[in-house]
């Protein structure tokens, strides 16, 4: 597998791999986002779901209760406060269309990690299409700000040695085509 460069990412963005696409790194007085040498820094939207214990008492990934979360929408350039030792879901501004021969891996930005805020996103499988749901953990004993419309994580694109036999689209992945924040699903 080879790591793809800014040249390749820019070329693929013209084919709709990332929309909207920012051709350069933007980062003055904000958490940076946009194209980097070997990746793309994604932005978090202004919609969040914060976990709460009001109205529910158990988190079950096989039978998720929507009462476990409170929906919050911030101003376009506002922020969301994630409570101490708590968890939030958000989504990317960007919509992705991953090529069949590519797997993308997402890593949290060090700006947030150095504040005790951990970002997790599972790999973007070949032929996945949709917004990315972002998992955000505040590991600190203090409230933490997440800035809407600013950088949150970096995506690295890896091209396979050969094209996969079965893509995410082929297997009708449960999160295919997701728009907005998508809560956990189990295929029944």
Swiss-Prot record:
Reactions this protein catalyses: dCTP + H2O + H(+) = dUTP + NH4(+)
Chain segments annotated as transmembrane: none
GO molecular function, one term: nucleotide binding
Pfam family, one: DCD
Top-rank EC class of the record's enzyme: hydrolase
Keyword match Hydrolase: yes
Binding annotation for dCTP: 109-114, 154, 168, 178
Similarity comment: family membership: Belongs to the dCTP deaminase family.
Cited HAMAP family: dCTP_deaminase (MF_00146)
Function: Catalyzes the deamination of dCTP to dUTP.
Protein name: dCTP deaminase
Taxonomic source organism: Helicobacter hepaticus (strain ATCC 51449 / 3B1)
